[in-house]
Each structure stands twice: as structure tokens, then as C-alpha cells.
Amino acid sequence: MNEDMMTEAERASIAADGTDSLLGERGKGVFHIHTLGCQMNVHDSERIAGVLEANGYVPATEDQINDNDLDLLVLNTCAVRENAAERMYGTIGRFNRVKLVRPNLQIAVGGCMAQLDRKKIADTAPWVSAVFGTKNIEDLPKLLDQNRATGKAQVQVTEQLRQFPSQLPAARASRISSWVAISVGCNNTCTFCIVPTTRGKEKDRRPGDILDEIRQCVAGGAKEVTLLGQNVNSFGYGIGDRYAFSKLLRACGTIDGLERVRFTSPHPAAFTDDVIAAMAETPNIMHQLHFPLQSGSDRILRAMRRSYRSAKFLDILGRIREAMPDAQISTDIIVGFPGETEEDFQQTMDVVRQARFSSAFTFIYSPRPGTPAAAMEQIPRDVVQDRFDRLVALQEQITEENLATFEGRDVEVMITGKLGKKDTDTHRVTGREKTGVLVHIGVPEGEPVPEIGDFVTVTVTHAGRHNLLADPDVAAGQTYSVRH
């Protein structure tokens, strides 16, 4: 959700950097982190930044990034898609072009691809200074020091998690929205997924530690928190408490000043009525849900080792919407999984028609090395592309129809940014309403202009293909009000 992220310049302007006066304005070096992948990687990048700042490094401003006036570039990689390696090596190659004009530039590579390809990275890209994994973020400053001292690439990737990344210092990318990890890793064995290999088995944090972190975020100005985990609703299963996640959601409702709570991602097999009730009954839990379907074919779901079937999936959706009629539910769908027939694909299309997702992250299947599905017989690319195009067209139609239902309604939007370089002249702001839909707002003449983090109740005047527009006419009785 890039709209609620601060720029590097904003982050640099508010960072409490106690080391600058001791080390000079560049500290041990000016750094920039380039993040690929999911929300967990964004969370980890905040920890990487926090560890670096705690060790005397200084975050780059936008001007420094644009001018390549950098001492350290960090790439936090993703391994989920087939082109992950291509993206990683392509980015490392671009970093090397910067190093050619800044010979003292250090380049560090971390994240899931580093966890998988640690040695290959150092061999293929000898200009890389350090390689570190998902489980030893805290080692990065030491590796950089060793590289400076020896001139040799430092590769250190651990298989055992020594401490939760959430226990490390954080340089949060947003003043108002915070990522809070409740677990790391995954115990599922989906045949297409590389995450258990890169992140390991699921480990849950203590609920008290999670709630303490949330309170700290709120004390620092956060108004919204997103709880993160590969499978959030199996939280607590390891200690035998199958109600731990719903208890955590309800506990979030007791935190003063916490306006909005979201979470991602749940697994349909573990999504239970107590979680639905907690969402419906806790005022600051938003009625937004990312609910991965992957396929509407029971045969393909079995081949994927997804421990639910389409009927159960739709039944859960029905219970969610009965409890929360306004719920906006998005999903993930893989097209072209090995062995998928046209009949299987049509079953997916049927489920999409019934589910009426607010949006869908739709992917062409890509084999990941070492996963069971990679060894299965693959489907011709042209067949998969045709199916993909048909599914995207169907979902876009449903999305547009869903957004159209917002026209004329009043929604409360948390402001997360300004629109365009001339926003101070046009007074256009952007944010998300309670169920996560992006809303672009035109501030009526003479009305107060909201700041980032303010809440605006406004009448939606137009639905776009992927967002809503609100250009209210206050004189005609349409709504516009700001809450700080």
C-alpha cells in the first residue's frame, strides 16, 4: 500500500538521529534501501533502516537518491515469483553502474533471494559487499565493517531465527501507519510456495509484546496498524490456543488512540467464526479482508495442497458478509497451475462471479525451484495467458461495479498523501476509507485542507476503475468535514 508510505525525505526529516553530531552529517554513510516484494519485506526494510541508523548511518534524502549521492545501497529481495532472480540481478547490475562512478559505494543484498542464493550472488556479482538473510538482519553493520576492512564480500546467512525482526530498532516509513509482525514463517506446505524455505517454520510473538509495540506506535503518532504474518489466523496454534488471534484483535480495540486495525494474510482453512465476530464487534478493526482463493477448482486446490475446497471458501465469505455487509474482500488467484484444464479454469471463473471480490491479485503460475509444483507438467504459455486475460477482464468488471456502489455515499478517509506536485495549489489529497478503498479528494474552496493523518468525511462523487473520487459541492448539501 504505497499511498500510506512516507518519502525518504519525510522520513529523514523526522528521524531522531542522535549520531549525526558525532559522526558528521553523513555519519558512517548515507544509505538507501530498495525493497522488492510483500508487506513483510517492507516491515523488514524498516528494521534494516533502524539497525543502520542505530549504527551511525544516515538515510538518504530524495535529492541524494536522485543524484546517486550514496555510500550504501541495500536491496531487500523477494523470491515469490519466477522472475525474482531476474529482478534481483537486474537491480544489482544497476547498482553496479552507480558504483562505477562512486567506487567506495557499498552494496548489500538481503531478503528471501539472499536466503536462497547466498553464494551465487557473491559469485555472480563480485561488486556486492555483503549478503545477509531474513533471519540475521542485525548482522548487516558488522558485515559492512568487515567488507571495508578486508575488501572482500561478506556472506552470512543463518537458518535459525535468533530474534524476531520486530525486536530490532525500526525506522518506520510512515508517521501514521505502522506494520506490526505477529509471527514469522509458515507451517503450510503449498506445492507452489517458496516461503517456508526462505522464512522457515511459523514462530509466533507473545501477545503482550505485540500489544506493547502497537502502543509504542500509537504513542509515536500512528493512527493505523496492520498486523502481519504469513498466516495470521493460525497465530497461537503452537501453544494450543486456537482463539489467540481473535483475542488479539479484541485487545487492539482497547488501545486508546488506535483508530484503524487491519491484518494480512489469513488462510481460509483456519478462518473461524470467532475471528469474524471479533472483526464485526471491535470498532477499530476494519471490515477489509485479503482472502487468498488461489483456485476455484477443488482438483487444483488438492494439487496445491490447499486444505479447503471452493464450497468451504464461499461459505466463509457468506458468513463474513452476513456479519459485515460492508466488507471489502480481495484475493489472490494463480492461473495456469500445472495440470489446470479449461474446466478447472471455468470453475475458478464461477467462484469469482459468486465471490465478487473487491479486487484480485492475479498471477500467472511461475515455478519456484525446489517446490513440488516445479516438477509437474507445465501448461503452454499461450494457453495460460489467454486464461489470465479472461480472468482479469472479469475481475475488472466486478471491481468497477463494486466501486460504483459508493457513488453518493459518505465515507471517512484517512489522509495519507497529497496528489501531484501542485497539490498545494489544487488542494487535492488522497487516502483510504475504512474498508481500504483508495479515495482522491478535491478540497472545496474555502474549506480546511487536511494534513496527513487527518480524517475527512466526504461524499463520493465518482467511481473510477480502481479508486473513488470525491469532489463535493458543499453548497448543494454534499459532505466535507475534517477531523484531526
UniProtKB/Swiss-Prot annotation:
Its cofactor is [4Fe-4S] cluster. The keyword Transferase applies. InterPro entries: Elp3/MiaA/NifB-like_rSAM (IPR006638), Methylthiotransferase (IPR005839), Methylthiotransferase_CS (IPR020612), Methylthiotransferase_N (IPR013848), Methylthiotransferase_N_sf (IPR038135), MiaB_methiolase (IPR006463), rSAM (IPR007197), rSAM_horseshoe (IPR023404). It catalyses: N(6)-dimethylallyladenosine(37) in tRNA + (sulfur carrier)-SH + AH2 + 2 S-adenosyl-L-methionine = 2-methylsulfanyl-N(6)-dimethylallyladenosine(37) in tRNA + (sulfur carrier)-H + 5'-deoxyadenosine + L-methionine + A + S-adenosyl-L-homocysteine + 2 H(+). Its EC number is 2.8.4.3. [4Fe-4S] cluster 2 binds at C186, C190, C193. Residues 404-474 form the TRAM domain. Gene3D superfamilies: Methylthiotransferase, N-terminal domain, tm_1862 like domain. It holds the Pfam family Radical_SAM. GO terms for molecular function: 4 iron, 4 sulfur cluster binding; metal ion binding; N6-isopentenyladenosine methylthiotransferase activity. GO terms for cellular component: cytosol. Catalyzes the methylthiolation of N6-(dimethylallyl)adenosine (i(6)A), leading to the formation of 2-methylthio-N6-(dimethylallyl)adenosine (ms(2)i(6)A) at position 37 in tRNAs that read codons beginning with uridine. NCBIfam families: miaB-methiolase, MiaB/RimO family radical SAM methylthiotransferase. This is tRNA-2-methylthio-N(6)-dimethylallyladenosine synthase. It comes from Bifidobacterium longum subsp. infantis (strain ATCC 15697 / DSM 20088 / JCM 1222 / NCTC 11817 / S12).
